Amino acid sequence: MKHYQVIGLIGALAFACQSVPSDTDLINDLKKDVTYLAADQLEGRAIGTDGEVKAAEYMAERFSEIGISPKGTDGFFQEFTFSKPSNPHEEAVIGTDGEGVTGRNVIGFIDNQAAQTIVIGAHFDHLGYGGSGSLHRGDSAIHNGADDNASGTAALAALAELLVDEKRQSNFLFIAFSGEENGLWGSNYFVKNPTIDLETVNYMINMDMVGRLNEEKTLAINGVGTSPSFVPALDLVNSDSLKLVTSESGVGPSDHTSFYLQDLPVLHFFTGQHEDYHRPSDDSEKINYEGLLQVVRYIDRLIAQLDTEPKLAFTKTKDSSGDSPRFTVTLGVVPDYLYDGQGMRIDGVSEDKPAQKAGLQKGDIVVQLGDSTIVDMMSYMRALGAFQPGQETQVAYERDGKRVEALVKF
């Protein structure tokens, strides 16, 4: 017997009463959705918990209110079970006989009687009270995950609100994934057990951490090399003068990877790392809701533009993570992944780690580590790969335009 209630089909009634949502309406809904999903009452939405079930039920209710149709295996829900391996070096596997951790994807559909379908997704799970994925050092605390990823989940609902009222040349499948924090479990399960024919999928859009658009309006978009159609379209619809920072690879630490590995074009939208990432301080009041709406509107314009083109060609990309060096030490910083200047800019510093002990701060730009010149993230990682625990080296960084050097011990 299911421990969540099945949502009734009231979509047709809701649709009949709707009008095109205004910016004010959308911002109010974004705030409402993020505030609910990131509330303490949901206890961090960890997969397999009551908080995750409540979040899934909430998204099913939102989809129903908006007027999109259920497309799970049980109404809006697609339940899945993964078993955790006893060996930490082995991957989790789909469980049998109900053993393991059970989660649920929430899936809705807009059927425009089109030949092609666009998948739009965002994960709604988070870390619960922390665990191995947390960067928090201290007593156990609820990790509300407002940016990661209540922001993307709220954006998912906002796009459904916009697209349900417009007759487009594509169908739309909306998926709120669970189990992303555990290793893309929900999206992995979906692509192996799809509720539509994957041959009809044109491309997939993933929104993960889109709630912290900065003053420069910097928006990272990963996967632009997975179809030749993406880059021209992304530039064409950038009427808000967003500062786009792009990468080609379709592989990354979020749910778009599962679809890329099925030979589908993918895009991952991301407004950047911050010092609240995977910490209890990632709360709803820190979300830039106007910026979140800008991301939603931008994606809506992109979808409209790509709807004017034939089915997108898929291009395999070089896996940037495959070339990443292996390293056994850490500086203890959160890099600013949106920084496009020379060096590696620090977006956060972990307590009691080598960087903090050496005096480095948020905003410092690392330009040299040992004998290695740091020009970007890859050169920074290569430099780290040369060191072993216990070794010392000089680190050079820029602060307020001045070069500073310090001794760092790993």
For each predicted feature, which ranges?
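His/Asp/Glu-rich mid-to-C-terminal helical/loop segments that flank catalytic regions of hydrolases
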Residues: 275-321
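Alpha-helical metal-binding/catalytic segments enriched in His/Glu/Asp
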Residues: 108, 118-126, 130-184, 298-299
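PDZ/PDZ-like groove recognition
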Residues: 317-362
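Conserved PDZ fold ligand-binding element
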Residues: 357-377
